[in-house]
């Protein structure tokens, strides 16, 4: 017991010393941290933020980054709702980008959709108070993917009532279609002259080198004509040759020498100049003598005509052949025969090279599509024809599906995987879009939409629909192949295909949305429920 009493104070003393040392060490470290925080705040802040910049990305950030980079692929595990949200965000982003690009001055050089040409892409050739003539830019000028359309151009002219486009000939074959109003077209050859009356939907071929002039005989309606031009001499370029001289162009007679003209007409040059080429002094004297306010030369290539002149020009004109067999030279109407596709949502008319001798050697087909408001032309593709489509009337939107060119990727040393791309654009009157062969397309009409199509390389072209109850190539696949091709079972695939009971044209609204709208209308009409 005595020994225990002696050791206990010693033990207490040792424990006290250890406690004091621990407290001293703690205070020293605390002061060091305080000094560090006050002396080096920047380094401390960097240490705090550095791990955050290097932290792994969340799935949401990965999806957003893929959307910014334009990647079409999804994360491996996504619900149906996430996929729908992904598509909706992508579509909204693409539409915003297209709208912003269309307002940019460098839009033509960096446009994301090289297959769409709005009405501003036309170049005006002639314009006066009576009308205008304009031509669309070359298709291969936008992208080399359309280089096979290098030798095809679109020309449009519009003229007011009671006007005439002066005679001319061109080094190009023309296939023209009337999209508004009425026209009387006269084609002149060395041995005869033939006049034709054309109405809405009528088409006519004007061979290269044929002199022609176009009259708008109507008293009220404007005339609108669209022509497909196929140049003869230089691919992609054609020229109009006028025998008359106006403020817009010179007569081709003015290109000959004085001696040649005198020998040609067996007349003095001064007389030739006064009658054919025009002389400013002589012209002014004639105007004063006749009391005219303005001569035809001052008006340009589109001039006014009197009612008496219109009666003479239309006296012997022939009309289109209607449902009769198309003639070798006369006009034909695109809607004269029964549509090849038709239901309550729209009609599709087509004239193929084997059915019309005028376009047979050109290997061109013509189509006319009527899509009613709120309807959809179901997805389909053409086997070999390239279609140039002109919006004649209405508004809508189209979606075209293509594949990124893998060969061009190799040329540009890109290592991106092959991917599907969607090219879409809103459509309005005067717009033009191209449908390459093999590219699936669908068209949605927000108002009654009328489309004129020129099919290039059209002989034996086949139109393959990807949905609908008829002419559906997906439906024709073997049952076993369907199971191997798609993730769903054969029963699910068959049920999905049969859900669309319409063919060629259908309602643009999904079935669920149609049902909800019907219920909404029924609810608005019904009585108010009691609480």
Swiss-Prot record:
UniProt cross-references to Pfam families, sorted A to Z: Cupin_1 (PF00190)
Signal sequence region: 1-30
UniProt entry tagged with the keyword Nuclease: no
Sugar-bearing residue positions: 444
Residues cleaved off as propeptide: 31-108
Positions with biased composition (Polar residues): 316-337
Superkingdom: Eukaryota
Domain Cupin type-1, residue spans: 115-273, 332-494
Residue spans of biased composition, Basic and acidic residues class: 37-51, 79-99, 286-302
Molecular function via GO: nutrient reservoir activity
Annotated keywords: Allergen, Glycoprotein, Seed storage protein, Signal, Storage protein
Region (Disordered): 37-124, 283-302, 314-337, 508-531
Function: Seed storage protein. Accumulates during seed development and is hydrolyzed after germination to provide a carbon and nitrogen source for the developing seedling.
Misc: The initial characterization of blad was made on a seed storage protein extract containing both conglutin beta 1 and 2.
PANTHER family per UniProt: OS03G0336100 PROTEIN-RELATED, VICILIN C72
Similarity annotation: Belongs to the 7S seed storage protein family.
Protein name: Conglutin beta 1
